[in-house]
Swiss-Prot record:
Keywords assigned by UniProt, alphabetized: Carbohydrate metabolism, Cytoplasm, Glycosyltransferase, Transferase
Catalysed reaction equations from the record: Transfers a segment of a (1->4)-alpha-D-glucan to a new position in an acceptor, which may be glucose or a (1->4)-alpha-D-glucan
GO biological process: carbohydrate metabolic process
Molecular function (Gene Ontology), one example: 4-alpha-glucanotransferase activity
EC class of the enzyme, as a word: transferase
Keyword Ribosomal protein recorded: no
EC numbers on record: 2.4.1.25
Species per Swiss-Prot/TrEMBL record: Chlamydia trachomatis serovar D (strain ATCC VR-885 / DSM 19411 / UW-3/Cx)
Protein name, per record: 4-alpha-glucanotransferase
Pfam families: Glyco_hydro_77 (PF02446)
Family: Belongs to the disproportionating enzyme family.
Main localization category: cytoplasm
UniProt subcellular location: Cytoplasm
Record's GO cellular component terms: cytoplasm
Length: 527
């Protein structure tokens, strides 16, 4: 493991040293929470963009410097933030209705807003109701904006021109998709899959295109407001940019030369999943992306840097190679030859890392070749360390001491794809007993408040530069702040289609978090 001084030398020799110099290498503490999980008294059934403003205030008051969120791209009728229908467009579900000018002129606005706000009291996010009620409200609100000439504002036209690379294709795709009742692309009539007929469709759906474009303009306005507040509070927002995209996305429809839908991407068999995983997501054609100088990727990063200071590069190994499933169910690595996948990864990293002002943090969990890890380190790209999984798997299985983590990393006790710390402790008694012995803590079958607090403290004292935990693991210090139903506390169970995936709601409102003096004092004492 390199020392901090060695890591600093790596940083200064890297192409992203200027970005690192802005962030600096002093320890950074943070909290991770999906936006959909948050709510305030004004939220309409789901976490909204402007909810991040009081959330930032809470983070700073507790001593956190980083607020990490999951992807906030438009997911259409899907709830998974990692299965979006656009790699760039934001999800209008997160628009803060209470902040929209002239909202009161929408018919029955007060009653409708109150009904949507009541959905925030449900123990889980109810996407179907929220999506339906917000969609109807936005349609009415758009008509109000048209009457007020807000859609004729020069700023809106400037936004459409600035973002034309992705905005117009997205708005047209959205319009066609809704016209076809959200049919998958492979069931669309050929008239809509034939891109040579786009001009005709643009005329047909002109009003719908402007509607979806205007919603994106509002999303942009609200998220830039969040970023400005974060800057004022010296809080770093860490976004999440997936490598992959839904097969039923605008990108696959419009930029089809960048993707192959005949095979799908997943994960190979490992210690935790003997059969591997098929994510049913299309493969990126890296050669075509390279020929276009990675324009698709660069546009994604350019737009995201309006909102984030750092970003989680999901499944970073995919820049080097994918685990590919063919139609018969057989899997393979592509490219397979280390010489080829290292050359591919080096080329794309050298282009992408300097095209953005954001600091990348790689999600390098799972089966990652050692030569890929070394190359990421040479680019000064941080990796991810999950203490329960950091073990000498090739030897005696001993846990890795917390002070032996690579400084170029982020430590997190749990992820959105794992159980919470308390659930893992209870569900995996053999592992948690070894973990307690490793940490010198007394073992009990249920994670005690003492052990929970000590493990959180230790996670904020690892040798990683970044120490960021799920909000669930902090709130569990107070039983009244979490659900009595354990499955409600888990964000996602990979490889499953479940009504409990991606519906996690933080039990206390942000107002309640802010006023919980005991929790806030305890969190402040962790660092």
């Amino acid at each position: 493991m390199p020392s901090l001084s060695q890591s600093r030398r790596i940083i200064q020799q890297s192409s992203i040293r200027k970005i690192w110099n802005q962030i600096d290498t002093s320890p950074k503490h943070g909290v991770c929470v999906p936006l959909f999980s948050l709510y305030t008294q004004e939220s309409c059934g789901i976490g909204e963009f402007l909810d991040l403003i009081p959330m930032i205030d809470w983070c700073i008051s507790c001593g956190f410097q980083i607020l990490q969120i999951l992807p906030i791209n438009d997911t259409g009728s899907c709830s998974s933030p990692y299965n979006s229908i656009s790699s760039i467009a934001l999800n209008p579900l997160h628009l803060s209705i209470s902040a929209l000018p002239y909202k009161e002129e929408v018919p029955a606005a007060e009653t409708r807003i109150r009904e949507m706000q009541q959905l925030s009291q449900l123990p889980q996010v109810h996407y179907e109701k929220v999506r339906s009620m917000k969609r109807d409200f936005f349609q009415e609100y758009y008509r109000v904006c048209k009457q007020k000439k807000l859609t004729d504002h020069p700023d809106f036209y400037a936004f459409c021109e600035q973002e034309k690379y992705w905005l117009h294709p997205y708005a047209l795709f959205r319009s066609i998709r809704e016209h076809l009742d959200n049919l998958p692309i492979n069931h669309w009539p050929t008239t809509y899959t034939d891109l040579s007929q786009i001009t005709e469709h643009e005329r047909t759906f002109a009003e719908d295109i402007q509607f979806h474009s205007y919603l994106q303009y509002l999303c942009f306005q609200q998220m830039t407001q969040v970023r400005e507040h974060a800057n004022c509070k010296s809080c770093l927002i860490k976004g999440d940019i997936p490598i992959l995209i839904s097969k039923d996305s605008c990108d696959v429809w419009f930029y089809r030369h960048y993707f192959s839908s005949s095979e799908s991407v997943g994960a190979p068999p490992d210690l935790y999943n003997a059969e591997g995983q098929n994510w049913h997501l299309p493969i990126c054609n890296m050669k075509t992306l390279q020929q276009d100088n990675y324009l698709w990727w660069k546009e994604r990063l350019r737009y995201a840097e309006n909102f984030y200071s750092l970003y989680r590069l999901d499944h970073v190994v995919g820049l080097f190679r994918f685990w590919v499933w063919d139609e018969s169910g057989c899997g393979r690595f592509e490219p397979h030859d280390p010489k080829n996948y290292l050359a591919q990864g080096q080329d794309i990293l050298s282009h992408l890392l300097t095209s953005s002002s954001m600091l990348p943090i790689g999600e390098d969990l799972g089966t990652i070749p050692s030569d890929v890890k070394r190359m990421l380190e040479s680019f000064a790209v941080c990796g991810t360390r999950i203490p329960r999984w950091e073990r000498n798997w090739e030897g005696n299985g001993a846990y890795t001491p917390f002070d032996q983590y690579d400084p170029l990393s982020v430590t997190s006790l749990s992820t959105h794809d794992s159980s919470t710390l308390a659930s893992w402790w209870k569900e995996s008694p053999q592992e948690s007993k070894l973990f307690a012995q490793f940490l010198g803590l007394p073992y009990s079958s249920t994670l005690s408040l003492h052990n929970h607090t000590e493990i959180l403290k230790l996670s904020h004292k690892t040798s990683s530069i970044f120490r960021i935990n799920l909000i669930n693991d902090y709130l569990a210090l107070f039983p009244d702040l979490i659900s009595k139903t354990p499955r409600y506390e888990r964000i996602n169970l990979p490889g499953t289609i479940s009504k409990n995936n991606w519906v996690y709601r933080v039990k206390p409102s942000i107002e309640d978090l802010s006023s919980h003096s005991k929790l806030n004092s305890l969190l402040e004492a962790l660092f």
